[in-house]
Amino acid sequence: MSSSQGRSPEQGQPPYTPEAAKVAAEFKSWDPKKDDPSLYCDLKGMPWMMLSRARTYPAEIYQTAERVDVFFELFDTSRSIRVNGKPAPKNISPSINGYSTATWDNDTLVIKTTALAERLYPSPQLRSEKAELTERWKMVKDPKEGDLIEIDFEIVDPVVYTRPVKGKQVFKRAAPDVVVASYNCPEKLWLKHVDDRRAQGKAAAK
């Protein structure tokens, strides 16, 4: 599948808390070209991995009665959704994609994601460990595009946002000859760049 459009929670004027607004403001003061996290293979995780508009990087969905697995070419990432409605285990460690469980509401797959890892360093995407994400997936038939998956998002994160925020994505079926390949992106480059950028700022202030 490939993405046809996406609207991320951070678009427009996000309802940031004062603490999150400070982190966002620090990032916005940097060079938007040189300080783009994607240049440093920053793995954003959920919900942004599902909201990417990188049309040249396809994804694959594998579905069984008990699981839905999604494999993304972009950054070689994947996520697993357990279709059992059970909450995340208490001993689960936070991760960039969190722990996702789902139930069916007629023809709509309702996914709840918790156990998300903190992202409170400078970047366009901020998230705390208190974040909870709800997705609603629905397959529709478009006269021109064919099979589409429409996805509505809502993220609740009291550390980052003052109210729930929403996003939307539409995936369309890729051509039969499209293959999900490897991206091969080095890790930890962005965090090193953040440290270097902060050091430059401190040196310039002296």
Regions found by a protein language model. Give the residues of each.
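PEST-like low-complexity, intrinsically disordered acidic/proline/serine-rich tracts
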Residues: 1-206
